[in-house]
Curated annotation (Swiss-Prot):
GO terms for cellular component: host cell membrane; membrane; viral envelope; virion membrane. The keyword 4Fe-4S does not apply. This is Major envelope protein. It is a single-pass membrane protein. Keywords: Membrane, Transmembrane, Transmembrane helix, Viral envelope protein, Virion. Essential for membrane formation. The chain crosses the membrane at residues 53-70. The keyword Transport does not apply. It is found in: Virion membrane. The lineage of its organism: Viruses, Riboviria, Orthornavirae, Duplornaviricota, Vidaverviricetes.
């Protein structure tokens, strides 16, 4: 099996050891951290401040890239409109 089984206490939903958690679950924790989906159970999760910082930066970079793509697309159409008015550059 590529991922170890995750043993969880049904009463507290706390994991006994960080090493028992699957990689997929750890990735989901890092993705959920900046969204605030941990709430009161944050003390039971094995997500460090460094992982949260990496996740916040990742979300910021992704949002920036999406904004750049939208802006670039708009700028390209604007540039084409400007260049269309100059015959020797079109």
């Amino acid at each position: 099996m590529p991922f170890p089984l995750v043993k969880q206490d049904p009463t507290s939903k706390a994991f006994t050891e960080a090493s028992e958690r699957s990689t997929g679950t750890q990735i989901l924790d890092v993705v959920k951290a900046p969204i605030g989906l941990f709430g009161d159970d944050a003390k039971h999760e094995f997500v460090t401040r460094q992982e949260q910082a990496v996740s916040v930066v990742s979300w910021a970079v992704a949002a920036g890239l999406i904004g750049e793509l939208i802006g670039y697309r708009g700028a390209r159409s604007g540039r084409k409109a400007i260049l269309a008015n100059i015959p020797f550059l079109a």
